[in-house]
Amino acid sequence: MKNKAIHDDLVAMINLYGVISVEDACTIINSYEKADLNPGTLYTSIQFEVLEANQMFLVNEYFMLEIFLDEFEYLDLIEAQEDLPYYQPSKKELLKYKEDLYQEETPELKALKEYIIKWFKGSKVEIVNYLDYLSYFLKDSFNIEDIPNSINEFGCTIPQNKFEEFIQLCLNAHMHTRLWQNRGYTNQELSEMKQNKQRS
């Protein structure tokens, strides 16, 4: 198994999950690569400068994004993820997450973006910047109460009679956004999994 495949898989998984234990990383890489990695062989295969170049680190047997190092936020994320399965897309889809800003273009996110382009007032740069911000905000620290201020901060406006529909589109997009605290699953997927489990 080539080290490049290990690095590609690992970088993509850390971007998708936010944090992942060394042991779980081995299990998932093995499932994609038909390999037999264990923590010992994984350590010897990794070039840590590759991870650091992607703002990723190994702390206490966990690979994580640098943003979760502040104030030990990774501990909160690990707790939030407890007992959840890992979302494992196709290998082709997984590797899209090598790009740190990649986000799956769901129909709900596409509808939200189209609505913003149609109804928001502001310069092209302001609207594009807000689209980028909102896409990241949906998966990181989404709070519906922050939406009005965020619009103003980016120099944009929206007609008052369109605001309620915009908020609903935000909520829909968030429900279908892959989240770190869900180990890559969307809230919608977890809800459906819970319902199916209750029926069985």
Language-model regions, residue ranges each:
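Acidic/negatively charged segments and metal-coordination signatures
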Residues: 1-200
